[in-house]
Each structure stands twice: as structure tokens, then as C-alpha cells.
Design a protein with these regions (language model features):
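Polybasic/polar functional segments that serve as interface/processing modules
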Residues: 1-112
Length: 112
């Protein structure tokens, strides 16, 4: 099953956040075609969740929670991102500050 190029999916995530008046930025740029995606979701500067696009058994992709959980300190989130970036040079990391993070996460996970 094919998927969108990483840079196209990242652009879509940025537009989706900005369309609702939220903040989104790329904090690590990976391979434009095949890079893995990691979203760091916060609300008013408070960390809420990390979401990663993963390959499923049927060959599709979906988003799942990973890394530090709700209200993790910024040092813990930065450490997690640093380890992931060293392990995966193709990684894209997107930081989002969302007014309604629970809704954003639910919509993202359900959309795959």
C-alpha cells in the first residue's frame, strides 16, 4: 500500500493546525520521501503527547502514542527526541501547540 511522501504529509499537518489558529512548526527535517513522522503535541506550552506514524501489519499506516506522556517536563521530551533523531536520521519532528489537543489527537489517530 502506498503512502504520501513525508514532506507532503508534514505540510498537511502544518496546514491543518494553522487552519484552526493553532501553532505548528518543523523542529527536525527528515528525508522528504521516506522519513518517519513524529508529532510533539502540547497545549499552552504543556506537553500532552507524542504521536508517531507506524506501519501496520496490513501494510497501511496509523498514528500511535509513543514517548513521554501527559505533562512530561521539556527536558524529558527533548531527551526522547534527541534519542529518536540519533537512531533515525530520516525522522521528521513536528511541534504543535493545539488549543484542543484531545480532539486533535482523536481525529489524527482515527484518520490513520
Amino acid at each position: 500500500m502506498s503512502r504520501l511522501s513525508a514532506h507532503v504529509e508534514v505540510a498537511s499537518i502544518l496546514r491543518r493546525a494553522e487552519a484552526t489558529g493553532d501553532f505548528a512548526t518543523i523542529i527536525k527535517k527528515g528525508d522528504s520521501e521516506r522519513g518517519s513522522l513524529l508529532m510533539l503535541v502540547s497545549s499552552r506550552g504543556r506537553h500532552i503527547a507524542c504521536l508517531e506514524r507506524v506501519l501496520t501489519l496490513n501494510g497501511g499506516y496509523r498514528w500511535q502514542a509513543t514517548g513521554p506522556g501527559d505533562s512530561a517536563q521539556s527536558a524529558e521530551v527533548a531527551g526522547f527526541l534527541g534519542k529518536r533523531a540519533r537512531f533515525d536520521e530520516d525522522l521528521w519532528a513536528i511541534e504543535l501547540d493545539i488549543a484542543d489537543p484531545e480532539r486533535f489527537i482523536a481525529e489524527t489517530i482515527s484518520a490513520g
